[in-house]
Amino acid sequence: MSRRGSYTFSVAACAAAALLGFAAHAEAATCGNTASGFETWKREFADEARGRASAESLAALMATSYSTATISADRGQKSFKLNLDQFLAKRGGNTIVSRGRALKQQNAALFASIEQRYGVPAGPLLAIWGMETGFGAVRGNVNTLSAVATLAYDCRRSAFFTDQLNAALTLVDRGILTSATRGAAHGEVGHTQFLPKSVLNYGTGGSLDSIPNALNATANFLKAHGWVHGAGYQPGEPNFAAIQGWNAAGVYQKAIALLGSRIDSQ
């Protein structure tokens, strides 16, 4: 996000205000860097949120467990040090292009409706979808609420992920997330891997495990970040700034632009 957020990542003003108020109270729960304090932290968080959060969402919070997979992934993050050619080779750029072109043809009506609504063509959406999850093949298998709760408890970025947890609990109330939802290690979900707050901000209704929902949300994200219909999206062109909002890594941004143009060229 960096992207949609992995890690960046409006909702209506009243919802935003509610979340801000919720966060201000919830931040009083004591963070920690080992599993030993997690259950106590959950109780503190729930006690402070009671009366503002629903019983259903708090029950979902209390059902979470400390995610060692999430902590391992978080501590093991590495910066992008590959050049563009190396990065594309590692990500299977040619496969993304060929599969993306086929999916563009197979889903022509969907992509036409998305472009009409948001001004975003198929190419960059397919490039993002292919790079994020291999067109849905690899969406992650970590419990989403446990991942986000673990990172909200963890002291390294507690404030950021407390905000994500508040959003996740709102999504539980809306039926978009459940205690069984699974995704990537930092709480990203769906075909294009949105963090909970981005689902709340840019989602267009329903789970992002639905392809149309995920692609519409992705186009909505790009439009909200300044995408202009018909303008170019290569480096130096107007819409590249919207792609930069998706992921902070320069090589990732350039890969989206290049793969998208190759998909759109046919």
What are these regions (language model features)?
Residues S10-G21:
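Bacterial N-terminal signal peptides
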Residues A53-Q266:
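Catalytic glycan-binding domains that act on GlcNAc-containing polysaccharides
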Residues F22-A28:
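Sec/Tat signal peptide C-region and signal peptidase I cleavage site
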Residues Y7-T8, A12, A29:
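Secreted/extracellular small peptides and ectodomain modules produced from precursors
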Residues T30-S65:
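N-terminal mature-domain "stem" immediately C-terminal to a signal peptide or N-terminal signal-anchor/transmembrane
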Residues M1-S6:
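N-terminal secretory signal peptides that target proteins for export/translocation
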Residues G21-F22, A63:
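Generic detector of low-complexity/intrinsically disordered segments
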